[in-house]
Amino acid sequence: MGFTFFQDENGRDFFPVGLQAHNSSTGTELIRKAIQAVKAYGGNCLEAPVYWYRLEPEKDVYEMELVKDLIDETRAVGLKLIILWFGMSKNGHPNYVPEYVKMNPGTYRLVIGPDGGTLPALSPHCEATLQRDKKAFQKLMEFLKAYDEKERTVLAVQIENE
């Protein structure tokens, strides 16, 4: 066996070749289009986003149906999956956080700019935000272990994509 970061479900080295779905690709139809592109390209892996606000639409309410569908769709055509976790920040913007976070800047603090005003970005130094993102991410990882541990369709999870 050579050196590799990835192994398939049988422990064999696996070199992922594929495409990354657009960061706004969500839902079964868009994922199917991305899968078709990977297959047309001759790839073996899809990178696709999972958004915090879709995973936790309300505080402490976690919905894994979209994650399950994403795994099922890639597994059905023999592809591997790398999940892109879009949590508290993407390119510095909180586009993918739940509404309860966006609507509560007193708890989930914004970045303070050089002039003392707030910027439209969640502060990476805010413990409340970090704990909520961490909890949602932990729920995702627990689901992945429970749902995909045997088949190992998911190769990796990229944390805080971009």
Language-model-detected regions and their locations in the chain:
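N-terminal carbohydrate-binding accessory modules
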Residues: 1-44
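Conserved, mostly hydrophobic/aromatic
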Residues: 11, 46, 74, 140, ...
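Structural preference for beta-strand elements that scaffold enzyme active sites
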Residues: 14-18, 45, 78-82, 152-158
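A cross-domain feature marking catalytic cores of carbohydrate-active enzymes
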Residues: 18-23, 48-50, 83-87, 159-161
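Solvent-exposed, acidic/flexible segments
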Residues: 24-31, 60-64, 126, 130-137
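Aromatic-lined substrate-binding rim segments of carbohydrate-active enzymes
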Residues: 30-107
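Conserved alpha/beta enzyme-core scaffolds, especially Rossmann-like or related mixed alpha/beta domains
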Residues: 42, 49-51, 123, 148-161
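Active-site-adjacent "subsite" loops/lids of carbohydrate-active enzymes
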Residues: 67, 88-148
